[in-house]
């Protein structure tokens, strides 16, 4: 007898409540028209890694701890003399989360990490891109519980992009609000 597959809390909530609420609000005719989360991209730019290669690897290790999935180091494509940057130098790291890991990360972001941000007054509601995707920046990655504060050499910022299948920003905002994203009024 096979055991039931694990379903993240937010995915179960989406299937049970959010999908029906969105259908009522926007009047979708088909279940496949209802917007859903597609992926979450975490990006950490490390400008200091031009001088020290290990900084990009350290950032990738910390991003791997935060995401629960291996982060890849990103390299420069062109040389820029003003930044003392040569081609193929490590300049950051990124990771793309989908399915169960994506829902788990969003759950941790909304319930644990964002309340730990200093002077947090809510997320900017104008950070949608016009196609239903939302981007936010975090100044210190140490707000995540996976990072050991004592072992961190320096606090780094990171970009988080939440990609949805929504066609408009209004639909995407309704979806993210249903997932308890704390937008400013």
Swiss-Prot record:
**Any Gene Ontology CC annotation:** cytosolic large ribosomal subunit
Q: Does the keyword Transferase apply?
A: no
**Which SUPFAM superfamilies does the UniProt entry name for this protein?**
RL5-like
Which keywords annotate this record? Answer: Ribonucleoprotein, Ribosomal protein, RNA-binding, rRNA-binding, tRNA-binding
Its recorded name reads Large ribosomal subunit protein uL5
Gene3D superfamilies, A to Z: 3.30.1440.10
Tell me the Pfam families matching this sequence. Ribosomal_L5 (PF00281), Ribosomal_L5_C (PF00673)
Identify the domain of life: Bacteria
| GO biological process terms held by the UniProt record | translation
NCBIfam families, from UniProt? PRK00010.1
Summarize subunit and interaction data from the UniProt record for this chain.
Part of the 50S ribosomal subunit; part of the 5S rRNA/L5/L18/L25 subcomplex. Contacts the 5S rRNA and the P site tRNA. Forms a bridge to the 30S subunit in the 70S ribosome.
Give GO MF terms, alphabetically. RNA binding; rRNA binding; structural constituent of ribosome; tRNA binding
| Taxonomic placement | Bacteria, Pseudomonadati, Pseudomonadota, Alphaproteobacteria, Hyphomicrobiales
